[in-house]
C-alpha cells in the first residue's frame, strides 16, 4: 500500500487512498514516531466521482491517538497540494469534503497582499501556497459546543477557568473542531504548556475535548501562538487553530480580522472577511517522501 508523507509548517501527515481498513487503529500504529512512520495524523482520501457528494474528493483525518478530527487546516493544504500535482484535477481549484463540510481550496502563486502585511520569511512563500475557504466560524456556546447552562446562545469570550497555574481566560471558537484561545503576556515555558495543554483539552467545559492555543499579541497583524492539539498533543502548527486565533483576536479587539499567525513551524496568513464572515487561510504544504507499506502492518 503506497503512502505519501507531507507536512504543513511541520504539522506532518501520512496520506493514503481509502482502502477500507480500521483507520483508528492504523493511525495509532503508523503515526508512532518510534515504531511506525511517525506523524501527527493520518489522512485518508478518495475521489467523489462516483458518489452523490458534490465535491472532487473527500478526506478523513485521524489523530495520532486514533481519534477522528472534524477538520484539519494543515492536512487539507497538504492533500490539495498533492492532488493538484498528481491526480486528474480541474486546474488548481478543488472542492474537498470533510466531516466539517465541503472546503474549497486553491493553489495560488505570486501571492501578494498589496503591502498590507509583510509575509517575508513565510515557509514556502516563494513557491505555490494553498488557499482554503474555511467558511464561517461558530461562536455561540451551543454550536461549539460547550457544557454550559443558561447562556447557550452567548459568544464564548474570556470565560475564566481555574488551573494549577492560576486563572486563565478562554475565548472559544469552532473552525470545524473546537478551540480554546488564551491570550497571554508571554508564551509559556514548555513544561507549563505540556501540563496545561491536556488539563484544558479535557476540561469539563468541553464535552468532546478541545484544541488549545496560547497567544501573544505582537501587533494588530502579528500573533505568536503555541499549540496543544486535541488527540495529538504539542504540535508545530494548527491551521484551524490559526483561524480560531484570528477570530478570537478580532472579537477581543486585538486585530481587525487580518493577520499572520506565527507558529513554531512557520507562518500562516488568515483573513476573516468582514462582509461574508468567512475565513480564509493561506499557507504552504510540502512533500517529504513517498513510500510503500509492508502488508504485515495490517495484520
From Swiss-Prot:
Function: Catalyzes the stereoinversion of LL-2,6-diaminopimelate (L,L-DAP) to meso-diaminopimelate (meso-DAP), a precursor of L-lysine and an essential component of the bacterial peptidoglycan.
Subcellular location: Cytoplasm
Keywords of this entry: Amino-acid biosynthesis, Cytoplasm, Isomerase, Lysine biosynthesis
InterPro entries documented for this protein: DAP_epimerase_AS, DAP_epimerase_DapF
Protein EC: 5.1.1.7
UniProt pathway: Amino-acid biosynthesis; L-lysine biosynthesis via DAP pathway; DL-2,6-diaminopimelate from LL-2,6-diaminopimelate: step 1/1
Protein's recorded name: Diaminopimelate epimerase
Site annotation Could be important to modulate the pK values of the two catalytic cysteine residues: residues: 179, 229
Gene Ontology molecular-function annotations: diaminopimelate epimerase activity
Annotated organism of origin: Natranaerobius thermophilus (strain ATCC BAA-1301 / DSM 18059 / JW/NM-WN-LF)
Catalysed transformations (reactions): (2S,6S)-2,6-diaminopimelate = meso-2,6-diaminopimelate
Amino acid at each position: 500500500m503506497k503512502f505519501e508523507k507531507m507536512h504543513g509548517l511541520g504539522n506532518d501527515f501520512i496520506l493514503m487512498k481509502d482502502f477500507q481498513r480500521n483507520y483508528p487503529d492504523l493511525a495509532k500504529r503508523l503515526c508512532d514516531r518510534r515504531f511506525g512512520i511517525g506523524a501527527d495524523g493520518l489522512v485518508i482520501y478518495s475521489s467523489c466521482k462516483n458518489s452523490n457528494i458534490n465535491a472532487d474528493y473527500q478526506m478523513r483525518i485521524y489523530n495520532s491517538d486514533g481519534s477522528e478530527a472534524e477538520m484539519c487546516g494543515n492536512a487539507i493544504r497538504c492533500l490539495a497540494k498533492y492532488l493538484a500535482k498528481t491526480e486528474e484535477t480541474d486546474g488548481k481549484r478543488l472542492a474537498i469534503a470533510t466531516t466539517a463540510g465541503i472546503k474549497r481550496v486553491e493553489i495560488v502563486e505570486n501571492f501578494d497582499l498589496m503591502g498590507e502585511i509583510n509575509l517575508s520569511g513565510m515557509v514556502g512563500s516563494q513557491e505555490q501556497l494553498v488557499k482554503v475557504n474555511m467558511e464561517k466560524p461558530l461562536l455561540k456556546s451551543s454550536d461549539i459546543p460547550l457544557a454550559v447552562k443558561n447562556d447557550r446562545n452567548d459568544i464564548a469570550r474570556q470565560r475564566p477557568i481555574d488551573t494549577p497555574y492560576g486563572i486563565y481566560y478562554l475565548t472559544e471558537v469552532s473552525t470545524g473542531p473546537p478551540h480554546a484561545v488564551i491570550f497571554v503576556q508571554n508564551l509559556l515555558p514548555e513544561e507549563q504548556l505540556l501540563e496545561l495543554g491536556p488539563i484544558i483539552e479535557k476540561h469539563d467545559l468541553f464535552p468532546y475535548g478541545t484544541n488549545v492555543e496560547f497567544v501573544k499579541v505582537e501587533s494588530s497583524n502579528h500573533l505568536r501562538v503555541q499549540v496543544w492539539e486535541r488527540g495529538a498533543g504539542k504540535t508545530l502548527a494548527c491551521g484551524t487553530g490559526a483561524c480560531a486565533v484570528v477570530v478570537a483576536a478580532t472579537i477581543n479587539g486585538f486585530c481587525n480580522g487580518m493577520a499572520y499567525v506565527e507558529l513554531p513551524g512557520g507562518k500562516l496568513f488568515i483573513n476573516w472577511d468582514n462582509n461574508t464572515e468567512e475565513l480564509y487561510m493561506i499557507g504552504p504544504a510540502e512533500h517529504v517522501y513517498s513510500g510503500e507499506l509492508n502488508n504485515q502492518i495490517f495484520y
